[in-house]
């Protein structure tokens, strides 16, 4: 990565602050914070009480690992306010162009325009779907945010007053802008409040952000935070608003003057307001060591939006959510593997439907309910286009409530949410060897890493606990990853025995004898999936897709048939 950024994060580490204590503002990896960069929370500490209880058990439902109770289902609308300053205004020639651009960028549907540009000797391409597209796709259509574009509104003072190197007066900016909106009837902000709390109010401010190396230190650093409406005499207070969760992002990419910023920063910050913590090392008291740790001992790196993945394609096409992130926000369940056998795994971008044989993410539990393994399938397409490779991604979760709520999930070893790389290299910049199967060459020849076991390197391990299975024979056929799960315990429940499954061909149809609920997968000779059936009877007839040679797989049995 050729640049570094720091973005402050709204997280419940503040929930535990007591009156008068210094509360560190969180930021994205790669940028050293100024000394003494703290805010003092003056409110009654009770207001920072966790907004929900936290799940810790194996029976935790999807959504139980989120750190707040912000609504995350349905078609929801949020205010997006365009803010400029007397001495720094938007680069657009007229209001119509400005409003149209942000309407498309935040509310568009399938934006596919590609714009190439040169920046510091490199060629980049802006192919930016909308923010609404991003969250619709990550949630499989369960959550579709839309934004009411408001503005532009000109602040009362120059940009340096609000930035001043440490964003000293951004709270004042938020309250000032909200007051202006209410006073001038530009929008009904109180209509966005839930029990006095606006869950998400977004500011896009004119110009670039302080987050880019070499930027003006008086500009605002993109971040998310909470503003408390304390004064009873204000228009905002009288409208019934008591707290505002806000995020802010800049208009311009780096120091280009005219190239718009991507959506990666916004999606990262917005995800905090939805309930996700950061998955990089947030140890700002020892920033240089944290940077070194990210480089040499990264947790999720470019594979997660909440780590370095928001920078993919310079932020113009941020990485899609991981299976655990989708699970945390209630958009995906994790199928538990309880018996050994053969399994297929569809792309994480595919909407799961186990009844139809579409499996998007698997979970391997351990003896500790908060420690488990997740298996997902990545391809270099869509939001995952700028991933380092294709194949099975194996991640380990070691849930720690304090770490999640306090936003120090991966500050210490062992990491509490991390990828288990196929090449056993945990460095952030070596992500091309992270997925299974992994092929490499050395002086002895070509080798393929197609297994991950409880006794191998890396260990199939979450925290201090091991699952009861190891994984072998990982292969990728088209967009499908297949693998075998073998029990490490002789008493473990096994999959149907080979002799319990039979596959035969007669009159152009397959006859499959297998336990009810078995998955029958049919591939063409190149390995491309053709059909998938979940059996509803012990003996079931299944038509072949057409003439030719087909590969049929059910449980531990694979047959080649010709029609």
Q: Could you tell me what each predicted segment is?
A:
Residues 21-22, 494, 547-563:
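C-terminal tail/sorting-segment detector
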Residues 23-102:
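Primarily auto-inhibitory N-terminal propeptides
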Residues 24-38, 91-133, 137, 142, ...:
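Non-catalytic C-terminal accessory/binding modules of secreted extracellular proteins
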Residues 187-199, 288, 294, 403:
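Acidic, glycine-anchored loop motifs typical of Ca2+
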Residues 255-325:
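The catalytic-center signature of Zn2+-dependent metalloproteases
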Residues 486-509:
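Residue-level detector of functionally pivotal "anchor" positions at catalytic/ligand-binding pockets or at interdomain
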Residues 519, 529-546:
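Glycine-centered tight-turn motifs at strand-turn-strand junctions
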Residues 523-529, 550:
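Short, glycine-anchored, charge-dense loop/turn motifs used at functional sites
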């Amino acid at each position: 990565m050729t640049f570094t950024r720091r973005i402050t994060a709204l997280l419940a580490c503040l929930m535990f602050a007591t009156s008068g204590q210094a509360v560190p503002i969180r930021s994205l990896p790669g940028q050293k914070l100024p000394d003494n960069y703290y805010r003092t929370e003056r409110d009654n500490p009770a207001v920072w009480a966790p907004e929900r209880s936290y799940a810790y058990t194996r029976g935790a439902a999807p959504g139980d690992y989120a750190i707040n109770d912000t609504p995350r289902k349905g078609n929801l609308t949020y205010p997006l306010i365009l803010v400029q300053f007397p001495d720094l205004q938007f680069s657009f020639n007229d209001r119509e162009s400005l409003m149209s651009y942000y309407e498309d960028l935040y509310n568009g549907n399938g934006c596919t325009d590609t714009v190439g540009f040169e920046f510091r000797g490199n060629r980049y391409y802006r192919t930016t779907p909308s923010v609404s597209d991003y969250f619709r796709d990550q949630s499989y259509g369960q959550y579709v945010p839309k934004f009411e574009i408001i503005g532009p509104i000109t602040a009362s003072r120059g940009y340096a007053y609000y930035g001043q190197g440490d964003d000293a007066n951004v709270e004042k900016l938020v309250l000032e802008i909200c007051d202006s909106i209410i006073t001038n009837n530009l929008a009904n902000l109180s209509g966005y409040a839930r029990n006095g709390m606006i869950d998400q109010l977004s500011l896009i401010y004119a110009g670039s952000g302080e987050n880019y190396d070499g930027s003006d230190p008086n500009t605002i650093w993109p971040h998310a935070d909470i503003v408390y409406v304390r004064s009873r005499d204000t228009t905002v207070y009288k409208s019934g608003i008591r707290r505002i969760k806000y995020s802010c992002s800049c208009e311009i990419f780096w120091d280009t003057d005219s190239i718009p910023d991507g959506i990666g920063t916004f999606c990262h910050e917005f995800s905090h307001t939805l309930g996700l913590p950061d998955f990089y090392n947030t140890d700002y008291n020892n920033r240089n060591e944290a940077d070194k740790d990210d480089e040499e001992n990264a947790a999720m790196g470019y594979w997660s939006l909440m780590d370095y993945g928001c920078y993919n394609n310079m932020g113009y096409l941020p990485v899609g959510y991981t299976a655990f992130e989708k699970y945390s926000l209630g958009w995906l369940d994790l199928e538990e593997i309880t018996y050994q056998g053969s399994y297929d795994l569809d792309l994480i971008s595919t909407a799961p439907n186990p009844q139809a044989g579409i499996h998007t993410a698997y979970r391997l539990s351990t003896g500790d309910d908060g420690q488990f393994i997740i298996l997902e399938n990545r391809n270099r397409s869509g939001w995952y286009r700028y991933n380092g490779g294709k194949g099975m991604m194996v991640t380990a979760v070691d849930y720690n409530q304090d770490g999640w709520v306090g936003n120090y999930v991966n500050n210490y070893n062992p990491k509490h949410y991390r990828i288990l790389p196929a090449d056993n290299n945990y460095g952030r910049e070596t992500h091309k060897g992270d997925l299974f199967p992994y092929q490499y060459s050395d002086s002895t020849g070509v080798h393929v890493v197609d297994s991950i076991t409880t006794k191998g390197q890396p260990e199939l391990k979450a925290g201090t606990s091991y699952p009861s299975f190891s994984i072998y024979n990982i292969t990728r056929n088209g967009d499908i990853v297949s693998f075998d799960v073998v029990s490490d315990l002789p008493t473990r429940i096994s999959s149907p025995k080979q002799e319990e499954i039979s596959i035969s061909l007669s009159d152009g149809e397959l006859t499959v004898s297998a336990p009810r609920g078995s998955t029958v997968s049919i591939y063409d000779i190149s390995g491309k999936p053709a059909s998938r059936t979940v059996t509803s009877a012990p003996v079931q007839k299944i038509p072949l897709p057409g003439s030719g040679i087909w590969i049929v797989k059910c449980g531990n049995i694979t047959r080649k048939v010709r029609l």
